[in-house]
């Protein structure tokens, strides 16, 4: 059984028919380094779209290449010189043990999937199937590091990865579908949805619903944008961030902004304050959710090539928030 594997070659967005709103969400995720969850029915294309994210990301910087190479050396992974600048993508199976996910093991320290994905993508397909093992993930996302206890000594491995995950809305996959009847009871749907910890849902900035593509769209000869074109916009947004954060230690993307940096770089105008005041009241947003919306809006403004976050950027950011679970 394969427990942990690379993600394979990136999928070109042009291969995916329709799903324009999902593609836009992936563009925003790539531009700002935001975590993303794709939810949809069976065969809706969730995994294909998740794999497309890697093709939108810029290459590793020289500093990042060295950091990734050090982890690969510790894990005794063979280096591919031709792909040294390509961001890693690791896709562990739900059957993977905690040690395979998070690191550890008897004898020498072995980096887990979260560290092997450092400065790249951690792809968790069928997220609810990982079950209780997901409990450690929120703290790792916050710290961007993995702490491994061995013989009373804490060892720290880097784990600054971008999470991209997929899930069905319920065990059978048809909850909320207009064409297929869901076979699950409300209680079963609730138990399934709650297998993704609330703390983890809260840390995922972009939640995307992936509908099944209808026959007309599926058989249309119309092609969407290739990943290379989208990646150019992502690269331009990343360059804006690199300039902005040149003097800010340990920050390379908007997703990594701390509170002080949010205050400095995510200021709102009067219309923006009015919109967010209404959103906080109507959606009962926590302080953490509020700050994540600002980070995301900063990325959307960067994609638009503007310095000031406006109401349109905030409105799009709010659309990516998680829907309430049952």
Label for each model-derived stretch:
Residues 109, 131-326:
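Basic, amphipathic alpha-helical bundle interface domains used for macromolecular binding and assembly
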Residues 1-36, 149, 290, 307-326:
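Peripheral, non-AAA+ core regions of ATP-driven protein-machinery
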Residues 2-7, 77, 116, 256, ...:
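A short alpha-helix capping/helix-coil boundary motif
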Residues 11-194:
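Conserved ASCE/P-loop NTPase catalytic core
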């Amino acid at each position: 059984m394969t427990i942990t594997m690379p993600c394979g070659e990136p999928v070109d967005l042009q291969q995916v028919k329709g799903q324009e709103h999902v593609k836009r969400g992936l563009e925003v995720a790539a531009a700002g380094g935001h975590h993303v969850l794709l939810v949809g029915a069976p065969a809706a294309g969730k995994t294909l779209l998740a794999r497309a994210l890697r093709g939108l990301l810029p290459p590793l910087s020289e500093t990042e290449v060295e950091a990734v190479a050090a982890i690969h050396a510790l894990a005794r992974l063979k280096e591919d010189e031709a792909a040294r600048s390509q961001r890693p993508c690791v896709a562990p199976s739900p059957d993977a043990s905690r040690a395979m996910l998070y690191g550890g093991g008897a004898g020498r320290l072995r980096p887990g999937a979260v560290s092997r994905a450092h400065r790249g993508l951690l792809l968790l397909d069928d997220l609810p199937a990982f079950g209780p093992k997901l409990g450690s993930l929120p703290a790792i996302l916050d710290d961007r590091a993995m702490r491994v206890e061995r013989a009373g000594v804490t060892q720290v491995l880097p784990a600054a990865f971008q999470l991209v995950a997929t899930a069905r809305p319920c065990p059978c996959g048809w909850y909320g579908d207009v064409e297929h009847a869901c076979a699950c009871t409300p209680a079963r749907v609730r138990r399934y949805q709650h297998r993704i910890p609330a703390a983890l849902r809260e840390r995922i900035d972009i939640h995307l619903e992936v509908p099944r593509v209808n026959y007309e769209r599926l058989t249309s000869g119309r092609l969407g944008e290739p990943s290379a074109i989208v990646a150019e916009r992502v690269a331009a947004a990343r360059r804006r961030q690199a300039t902005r954060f040149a003097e800010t230690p340990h920050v390379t993307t908007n997703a990594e902004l701390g509170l002080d940096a949010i205050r400095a770089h995510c200021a709102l105008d009067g219309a923006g304050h009015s919109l967010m005041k209404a959103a906080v009241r109507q959606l009962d947003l926590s302080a953490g959710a509020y700050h994540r919306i600002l980070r995301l809006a900063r990325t959307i403004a960067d994609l638009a090539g503007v310095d000031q976050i406006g109401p349109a950027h905030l409105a799009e950011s709010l659309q990516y928030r998680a829907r309430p679970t049952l």
